[in-house]
């Protein structure tokens, strides 16, 4: 083998190794989980939304559990309701091995069972790693308008 060909092969192997070692940053994974939760809401898919929450999820200081949120979406689905969640900018901050994400969300519905204008909410979510995934273990929200 010619030295230039060997050098080229070495560069290819090193480049492939570097790509294989690349790990998606936690902030990106959390942002993707938030987007997936919004999509699950748009699709009125209770199981897809619950998948993003931990079993011990605490919503608004005990007001809603993971099961409560799932039941709300199931009820909306059974009644043929449409939901829409439009996210505002998401700000993610590390807190040790966990993260806090703050954002606004505008919720609307088709108006069959729920009011058409559900409101604009300021949301703070807390995230922790669960295996390879990031799951929300707590959230607080306040209606803005």
Model-found features: residue ranges?
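Second-shell loop/turn segments in exported
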Residues: 38, 55-61, 112
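Surface-exposed, charged secondary-structure patches
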Residues: 74-117
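Short, low-complexity, disordered segments immediately C-terminal to signal peptides
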Residues: 26-37
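Extracytoplasmic/periplasmic/luminal assembly and interaction segments
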Residues: 58-84
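Bacterial N-terminal signal peptides that target proteins for export
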Residues: 1-9
């Amino acid at each position: 083998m010619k030295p230039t060909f060997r050098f080229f092969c070495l560069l290819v192997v090193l480049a492939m190794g570097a790509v294989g070692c690349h790990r998606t940053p936690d902030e990106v994974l959390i942002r993707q989980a938030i987007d997936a939760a919004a999509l699950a809401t748009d699709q009125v898919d209770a199981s897809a939304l619950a998948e993003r929450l931990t079993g011990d999820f605490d919503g608004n200081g005990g007001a809603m559990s993971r099961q409560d949120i799932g039941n709300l979406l199931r009820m909306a689905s059974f009644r043929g309701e449409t939901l829409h969640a439009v996210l505002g900018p998401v700000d993610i901050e590390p807190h040790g091995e966990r993260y806090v994400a703050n954002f606004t969300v505008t919720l609307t519905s088709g108006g069959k069972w729920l009011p058409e204008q559900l409101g604009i909410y300021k949301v703070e979510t807390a995230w922790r790693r669960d295996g390879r995934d990031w799951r929300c273990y707590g959230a607080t929200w306040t209606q803005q308008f």
